[in-house]
Swiss-Prot record:
Pfam families: AAA_2, ClpB_D2-small, zf-C4_ClpX. The keyword Isomerase does not apply. Zn(2+) binds at C16, C19, C38, C41. Belongs to the ClpX chaperone family. One of its GO terms (cellular component) is HslUV protease complex. The lineage of its organism: Bacteria, Pseudomonadati, Pseudomonadota, Betaproteobacteria, Burkholderiales. Residues 4-57 form the ClpX-type ZB domain. ATP binds at P149, T150, G151, S152, G153, K154, T155, L156. This is ATP-dependent Clp protease ATP-binding subunit ClpX. HAMAP family: ClpX. Keywords: ATP-binding, Chaperone, Metal-binding, Nucleotide-binding, Zinc. It comes from Polynucleobacter asymbioticus (strain DSM 18221 / CIP 109841 / QLW-P1DMWA-1) (Polynucleobacter necessarius subsp. asymbioticus).
Length: 453
């Protein structure tokens, strides 16, 4: 007779066609045409499908785009101050990704009977850049130029935007770029890094963000075109033109140098958002010369001393100032959105130390918590740290080195010390270079030993 298990001898035991478990080992067994699947296999398949869907590039209508107010609100959590720059960036990024929603969807590749992709009959048409068209109006992208002193938050703004929008993001250093054919990095290496950031998913890379830092360091050396070849200055600006505007960049599939017999990945840069940032040290003097009132003759106005600060001058920047600084007009025209960042004052630096989600004081508090101790930084100490950073002219970047220097001895000794409850940084620890206070636990046999470390 047939195999049976159970109370009824005529009952046939059913098994999952995928994992082989019997109907008695699982909660539910669902029947199909001559096959069965259990609830455990269904859960596993659901997880696999969700992971695969998460890896796919988001298509139109998949997710609502955050409004400029929401984008700025997210930036406020990580970046202190710079209200004008945040508002400018929020509008530019919102318009850019709203424009991407109107791009034609990529056509799926046709496969032959062996599963291999069939080449398009019209190769020229297949390589045309995708353009966003709404009611017959073609929408062009607006790349962004960030101008501000060092340590004012240019890079952090770009990083926060990319993290919020969940798009591929890459940072490039303009000082390492040279013209094609010379020792150094070609501008197309930037796109190669973007591809690496998204595991060579071309569709995803074509919607990414590229941040080119130190763009002011590739300015040409004078107002007039040089008679000698400037391969790391004006030459790089010329090479960046088509990449920033939009072109089909040929990128080696797995990096390395190009050679004639190599297959290339074609990446359309038309819909990649380029953000260029630089300190532009000395630009304020160019603006000051342009805005100063001068005259000739007995009734001429004698220009007085301009008391405006760097931040006030940078707000008045015009394309002609950037050209005089050394950027070529063609590149300036391809960076239509200009956002200036203000120089950080003492109050802003104190806020940077304590308020953002990943504030510097919170980071060191977390480090000391791992050793079983607390960290207290008094208000006077915060003010002293901010004043020291302003004196060094390093902006927010100088805050970490000052705080690190103050805590160096404590972090060296703390793992070897026992029963340290709290570390206190006061004004003397910063201004005079004194060591922080160590507060020991009170429930020990020894008395309160609050003293200098």
């Amino acid at each position: 007779m047939s195999d049976t298990t159970g109370t009824n001898s005529s009952e046939k035991v059913l098994y999952c066609s995928f994992c082989g478990k019997s109907q008695h080992e699982v909660k539910k067994l669902i029947a199909g045409p001559s096959v069965f699947i259990c609830d455990e296999c269904i859960d596993l398949c659901t997880d696999i499908i969700q992971e695969e869907i998460a890896k796919l590039p988001k298509e139109e209508g998949d997710e609502s785009l955050p409004t400029p107010h929401e984008i700025r609100g997210n930036l406020d959590q990580y970046v202190i101050g710079q209200e004008h720059a945040k508002k400018t960036l929020a509008v530019a990024v919102y318009n850019h990704y709203k424009r991407l929603q109107y791009l034609p969807k990529p056509k799926k590749e046709k496969l032959d009977k062996d599963g291999k992709p069939v080449e398009a009959s019209d190769k020229k048409e297949s390589k045309l850049p995708a353009k966003a068209i709404v009611d017959g109006v073609e929408l062009a992208k607006s790349n962004i130029l960030l101008i501000g002193p060092t340590g004012s938050g240019k890079t952090l703004l770009a990083q926060t935007l990319a993290r919020m929008l969940d798009v591929p993001f890459v940072m490039a250093d303009a000082t390492t770029l040279t013209e094609a054919g010379y020792v150094g990095e070609d501008v197309e290496n930037i796109i190669q890094k973007l591809l690496q950031a998204c595991d060579y998913n071309v569709e995803k890379a074509q919607r990414g963000i590229v941040y080119i830092d130190e763009i002011d360091k590739i300015s040409r050396k004078s107002d007039n075109p040089s008679i000698t070849r400037d391969v790391s200055g004006e030459g790089v600006q010329q090479a960046l033109l088509k990449l920033v505007e939009g072109t089909m960049a040929s990128v080696p599939p797995q990096g390395g140098r190009k050679h004639p017999n190599q297959d290339f990945l074609q990446v359309d840069t038309t819909n990649i958002l380029f953000i260029c940032g630089g300190a532009f040290d000395g630009l304020e003097k160019v603006i000051q010369q342009r805005t100063a009132k001068t005259g000739i003759g007995f009734n001429a106005t004698v220009p007085g001393k301009d008391e405006r600060g760097v931040s006030d001058l940078l707000i008045e920047v015009e394309p002609e100032d950037l050209i005089k600084f050394g950027l070529i007009p063609e590149l300036i025209g391809r960076l239509p959105v200009v956002a200036t960042l203000a120089q950080l004052d003492e109050e802003a630096l104190i806020q940077i130390l304590t308020e953002p989600k990943n504030a510097l004081v919170k980071q060191y508090q977390a480090l000391l918590t791992m050793e079983g101790s607390e960290l207290e930084v008094r208000r006077e100490a915060l003010s002293a740290i901010a004043k020291k950073a302003i004196a060094r002219k390093t902006g927010a970047r100088g805050l970490r080195s000052i705080l690190e220097g103050s805590l160096m001895d404590v972090m060296y000794d703390l793992p070897s010390l026992k029963n340290v409850q709290k570390v206190v940084i006061d004004e003397s620890s910063i201004a005079e270079g004194g060591k922080p206070l160590l507060v020991y636990k009170q429930d020990l046999d020894q008395p309160d030993m609050s003293k200098k470390a």
